[in-house]
Design a protein with these regions (language model features):
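Structural signal for interior beta-strand "rungs" in well-ordered beta-sheet cores
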Residues: 1-187
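Terminal amphipathic alpha-helical/low-complexity segments used for targeting or macromolecular assembly
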Residues: 1-5, 10-11, 16-17, 53, ...
């Protein structure tokens, strides 16, 4: 069902059961998957592919040119998976040639009011961005992460799986998987124990992660502490996720406790 006040380019690919409310504008390069609902006043442009069962609320803008002065009109795209909810005034920009030309969001994500996802970002699945989270260019947010309201995330930063970032945090450094990070400039303050329990990770593994945290992040020179870990701790699959995250990308520093270097 398409409201007669909406403007749909004839070259757009719209599944038969998509609902498009009043005053929406859909460009020629847009694909909308089955059972997706657009409430009203939504602008989707560019080469934008949106999957199934998404719900998009009023005044959302997706696929308009990236806010990057280096962007010169090169081809780019935005790819969004299934079962996402984008609340009012969410803005998602496509990629640039400096970042692979693609912005990607996975499945089952909730982006609350006024969230911005900049060019070349890569967001996984089951992520929650609370109201007014501002995600800079080239940012990676892994599965099941939660970012509190009014956070600003510096370009090229990474937030690991099942991490929790407290509200109004300025994220300048990478947040480890399962980490809890907050503050004016994000400091690591512990593990996201609530998230770990909700994910049904065993008490044994949670205790081992706590021991890992106390060994690595409660003493100076955390990288040397990792090298000196006992073999059985390094082999734990959750510890390995954190170590691989730390070793995989060094564009931004790792978020650490305030007194650790």
């Amino acid at each position: 069902m398409i409201h007669p006040s909406s403007i749909i380019d004839p070259n757009a690919k719209i599944s038969n059961d998509v609902v498009i409310g009043p005053y929406c504008v859909i460009g020629p390069g847009v694909e909308l998957g089955s059972n997706t609902k657009l409430h009203s006043h939504i602008n989707i442009k560019g080469t934008t592919k949106i999957g199934k069962n998404n719900e998009i609320f009023p005044f959302v803008s997706i696929g308009t040119p990236p806010q990057d002065l280096k962007y010169k009109g090169e081809k780019n795209s935005t790819i969004i998976g299934d079962n996402n909810k984008f609340r009012e005034y969410v803005n998602i920009n496509p990629g640039t040639s400096q970042g692979g030309t693609i912005t990607k969001l996975g499945n089952n994500n909730l982006l609350m009011v006024y969230c911005h996802v900049a060019h070349d970002c890569n967001l996984g699945d089951n992520i929650v961005l609370a109201n007014n989270v501002q995600v800079g260019g080239h940012v990676t947010i892994e599965n099941n992460a939660i970012v509190g309201g009014s956070c600003a995330i510096h370009q090229f930063s990474r937030i690991g799986s099942l991490a929790l970032v407290g509200g109004m945090t300025g994220v300048l450094s990478d947040v480890i998987p399962f980490g809890l990070s907050l503050g004016n400039r994000n400091n690591l303050v512990g593990l996201n124990l609530v998230g770990l329990r909700r994910a049904k990770i065993s008490n044994k593994d949670i205790k081992l992660l706590q021991n890992f945290y106390n060994i690595v992040f409660c003493n100076q020179n955390f990288r040397s502490n990792i090298e000196n870990l006992e073999a059985d701790m390094k082999e734990n699959k959750y510890v390995k996720i954190i170590i691989d995250f730390i070793n995989s990308d060094k564009k931004r520093p790792i978020s650490l406790p305030e007194n650790i270097k």
